[in-house]
Each structure stands twice: as C-alpha cells, then as structure tokens.
Amino acid sequence: MGTVVSKKENLRNDAISSVAAKVRAARAFGEYLSHTRPENRNRSDHLLSDTFIGQETDSPDISRLNNNNSLQPYSQHTLIVKPSQEELQQGSQSAPLPTSSKRRLSVERSLSSEDQQNQRRTESSVKPARVYTITRERDMLGGQGSEESLELEVLKRTSEPSQINPPTGLRGSHHRGSQHRGNNGPTHQHHYGHAPMAQPLQSSGSTHNIRDWGSRRSRSREDCTPDCVACIRPHCQSQRSLDLDTSPHGGGKQHKKLERMYSEDRVSSEDREDHTNSWFPKENMFSFQTATTTMQAISNFRKHLRMVGSRRVKAQTFVDRKAKSFSRSWSDPTPVKPDSLHDSRDSGDLQASSGNLDEEDCDDVDWEEERELERVACEGDDFIPPKLMLISSKVPKAEYVPNIIRRDDPSIIPILYDHEHATFDDILEEIEKKLTAYRKGCKIWNMLIFCQGGPGHLYLLKNKVATFAKVEKEEGMMQFWKKLGRFMSLLNPEPNLIHIMGCYVLGNANGEKLFQNLKRLMKPHGIEFKSPLELSAQGKEMIEMYFDFRLYRLWKTRQHSKLHDYDDLL
C-alpha cells in the first residue's frame, strides 16, 4: 500500500513540474515579445496575469488590461488574455473614472468613440490578427481534477471579426457553462465568432503556485463546457502530455513496468551483495567483541588445544561438518530400523535363537579370558583401581576442572573432550589410551560423566542426546555404551559405579528407564548408575570422591562469572 501511494505522489510531482516548465516557457515568450515589439511591451507584461493563483480577477490591473484591450486598436500582432464573463461585462460597460468634472468625462467619452472608429478602419485594412491566449486544460494530466496544465496557443483569425464585445444577452445564452469561478476557473470566449485552429506551445510555471489548483477546483469539466457546438474548441491531434499517458490502459502498463523495474533492481542489488561476500567464509567473519568475550575466546582456544576431538577441526571444514552432522533434535522421534530381509518368520526365529546361543557361549568364553587378563595386569600391592572422569566442554569453565581434582589421589584420570567436534569413537579411543598409560590391561572401577543434560536425558555430544528410546534404536548410541561397558572392570566384587554429574537425570521416570536400558546394553558387566543432587549427602560424597571440595566450591561460585581470577585454582 505504501508503494502505491508513493508512486501516486511521484506521478503528481512529475505532473506539477511539467506544468511549471510550461508556465516558465510562456513567461519567456512574453518577455521575448516585449523586447521584439516595443508597441506590445505594456501588454506583454499581463500575458500571464490570468495564470497566477494569488491574483484576483477583479483587481484594477486586470480590469484596466481588459479596458485597454477593448479601446486600443489592434496592430498586426496583438496579445490579449482570455477574460471571463464578468470581466467582459465590466469591459463592455464604460468604467466610471474617478473625476469630479462632467466636462472631463464627456471629453474622454468622445475620445473613446473616436478610438473605436479608428479601430474599425484599421481592422478592415490590416491582415488577420494573431491572438495569444492562455487556456487551462483539465484532461492533460489524466487526474480527477486535482491538477491542470497550461497551454499557450497561437490563434490565427481566419475571417473578419464581427464584434469585439458581443451583446450581453448572447453571452448569457451561449456561455452559461463558462461562469467565472473565483480566480482559477477555466474561461471560454468567442473570438470573432469562429472556432480557432490551435497549435499549442506547451510550457510550464512555478511549482509552489500550482500545488493549490486541485484544492481550488470545485466543479467538473462538464459544468464549464459551453452549450453551443460552435464554442467547443476541437482538441489538437498533436497535443500530448510530456510526462504521462491519459489512457487508463497505458497508466496501468506504466505502473506494472515501474514495479517490475523496482523488483529487478532490488534482486540484482541483493545478488551483488551475496556474490561479493560469497568467497569469504561467513563463519570466520570478524565480530566486534568485548574484552570479556575476547578473553573467553582465548581461554577456549587454549582449552581446545588439549581437548579430545579438537584435532578434527583442522581436518574438516565448517561446511562438511554441517552437512555430516546429525541435524535432528533429541526430542524428534527416532526412525525404527527395518526388519530383517528374511520374510519367513520361522527360519528367522530359528537362526536368531541359534545365533543367540552361540553368542552367549562366545561371550562366556571371552568374559573369562578378559577377567584373567585383567587379574594378571592388576597384580601387585601398589595397584589402585582407576577412577575415570569424562568432562564435556559444554560445561561452563570446564577447562579448569582438571585443576580442582583431588591431588592426593593419583588414580583419578581426567579426560576433557570437545562437545562440538568429538565423536564417540574419539572418546573411546582416548579412554583406551589413558588406561593403557595408567596400567596396561586395567579396567575402570568408578567413572564420572560430567556433562549437561536434564531429567531423563544426557547431552553427551552435539546432536547426540541419550534418552531411554534413542539408546535402544540409534546404532551409534548403542555401540558407544556397549563398548564403554567393555572398559569396566570384571574384578570388582561390587557393581562398577558410573556417576552422572552436571544434571539431574532422575528428575522424572524417564531417567530411571534410561539407566535400566544402559545397564542392559552394558551386560555382562555389572554397572550401577547414580545421579545424586550435589547439595545432598550422596552428592557431597560423590564430589569428595573426585574433587578437592574446597577448590570445587571456589570453582562453582565462579563458574558463571565473567571475571578470570582463577589464580587460586591454577
């Protein structure tokens, strides 16, 4: 809607500027006549008197101009202004002169009668006169009477004039439609009783005087049209508007063309902006940061240098990671794996049952072998069962967690992994390396998973959320927990503990279901999951098992602070 209004305003301004140009041309033409024809110098000043908006037609200048035009004899080239009916009536009647002497009045009347006789003699002997008039056309702009254009027309008289001022009765009968309306109404008058042949000289005027024409108009063109056919001036075929088309179809086409050009320009500019910046990766665009966020970025960079999975950033670009990442939300339903390709249920069930029996036998054999290997590796009085800490970089200030662990317990093995770029295989590979470095062949007795999450779910990796449904249906999630179970100890007489810290998974019933499904996946190893609240007694016991309690409280108080005063922790 705003675009249509602005286009209409632009069309209106263009029309007004065109009319202003026409009036300026008319004024220049009048000045030219005043210089070239000295006898017309006084009358050329009033050529545009009827076009000015603020000038009243009843002013003394206009009435004196009309009287002069009726009294002075016509030369070969005469300039007059189209008068209105009231002006003609005033011109036909002798205007009273402000004199006190009747003798002076009689002398002036005798002079006027002699001038009229001389005028008739001159008209019979000279060539046809050219009369320059200024008319106002309403239909040139194609509007609803809001604006109007001026046209300077050169009218050539083709025959002898019958009378300069026709009788009042004839004017009243023929020109009822051309009543003078204020100082802006279009005037119409018989010039020597003939319809003229017009050759318009289109010109312009000042813009500030033209803007109020539409508001001063109160009647339509039909009210101003004379009744007689002879009074109607035929439109010239060469008369055209310089800026607008009067036909409605042409206007509509022009509107559509403007809209199309605007849309093409807008699209082309957007495409140019996109093409200029397309070569530069948008993820690397420099953004103005505060000092706090800059320091945080520096610390994160140092954190990624020693983080598991951060090396993958150099190997993969941002686009490849975005294309290969798991884009589904953790709350979306997981697609169910298709059934086996065997259509016969009987043969499939028999093969599955026989396969399960074979796998159970193999698992029993492997379980015994692994247990013996672990017993051999863990012999000695100096052996302390390892405690593994798996810390996600998604935890706020996670880079300081390795500095707040218990320093009197060498069995704690912290592993900080990259939440954004690491994979399950990277985590399992790092766990195997750390256990081998601690003691070859040993297994985990206690484990802490420090990550984000909530009631019923664990946010282990980016786009990898462990829920009770997804750990049963997503292949990657299932394989991770199964392989993680193989790193758990077989020598521990009690179930191996896996503490979940950083979130309260048991906040609803789905958390218990998640723990049950994870236990089933990690069999035959005995696993027990715990996720106590940190403020509870069990939570304090869990914290003291892995952390220095004083440093942990200091780290916890400054975990969400933007200040980097960790000198006590470092």
UniProtKB/Swiss-Prot annotation:
Residues 85-224, 239-278, 327-362 are annotated as: Disordered. InterPro entries: NSMF (IPR033374). Stimulates outgrowth of olfactory axons and migration of hypophysiotropic gonadotropin-releasing hormone 3 (GnRH3) neurons. May couple NMDA-sensitive glutamate receptor signaling to the nucleus and trigger long-lasting changes in the cytoarchitecture of dendrites and spine synapse processes. Keywords: Cell membrane, Cell projection, Cytoplasm, Cytoskeleton, Lipoprotein, Membrane, Myristate, Nucleus, Synapse, Synaptosome. PANTHER family: NMDA RECEPTOR SYNAPTONUCLEAR SIGNALING AND NEURONAL MIGRATION FACTOR. It is a peripheral membrane protein. One of its GO terms (cellular component) is cell cortex. A lipid is attached at residue 2 (N-myristoyl glycine). Its main location: nucleus. GO terms for biological process: positive regulation of axon extension; positive regulation of neuron migration; regulation of neuronal synaptic plasticity. It is found in: Nucleus; Nucleus envelope; Nucleus membrane; Nucleus matrix. The keyword Cell membrane applies. This is NMDA receptor synaptonuclear signaling and neuronal migration factor. The keyword Lipoprotein applies. Residues 86-99 have a biased composition (Polar residues). Belongs to the NSMF family. It comes from Danio rerio (Zebrafish). Residues 209-224, 259-276, 339-348 have a biased composition (Basic and acidic residues). Signal peptide: none annotated.
